[in-house]
């Protein structure tokens, strides 16, 4: 797809080697917009950044080849880039100290501004720990909270599975570019999340899983969420970093206790000693956050409302299910159910290749 001028300016600036989040914020504070930064004189830029970086900016920023790669990635209707200037940018991140200027996203971007809750923990989780994470995630998701985690093995993966099984779905925040999945063992899970949830990253396409990326990923996990639950964690677990960042951002921190003999309970016990709230059920979290389980809706009325919402996102040109999910923010299961209903009532028709179009 062709990049519009504003997005091209964001990309040309953000893809320059040496322009990280803090530097870009400084430049935007001084010059207003990415286009303003790129149009600035070397002398003006040198007041804010080192001369070598100023030269890279005045040379026009990132290469045309780099931008072409991003444009090709955006040809997939499930893929998005959201900037600080966009209305879709998550309001919860705007309240943090250093919100990423750009977010690369794959899936339902409407989830970014829904109430969210994070669940994290050990990569080497026990079977009970994984079961707890999945069960808590499903219950919290059914209460309307999008489940946020980091797509790691163990507790993260279980939390995502629970979120996918709930009515609210899940967001995976990753420490690589969105053109790869890390760890590779979670590729099927990532596929499911992209289809009915959302995967986001602040890192450019092609970014490998460098160790320094994951603390930055962790700050986004807790920045998106109203609170963070640590399910299992050793005393040296990265989940404790996430919990610390959450506390610094004013988020609630919760922990599930375990056996005094279990290494995977020591991190949770340390958090509880430091003031994290001990929880034994998802209801404990809901009560602390002032949330409640939703009332069972009238299914007939809800289905009719869902049909109307979906119809607004189907035009007279053929469109596939993934594109409809992206436009509407609905999960694939909801979309497929509504498509069947709309076809029965004669408002849309199915076409070869799994595509649909409006009839009248």
Identify the role of each PLM range.
Residues 1-5, 84-360:
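Glycine-biased, small-residue-rich flexible motifs in mid-sequence functional cores and linkers
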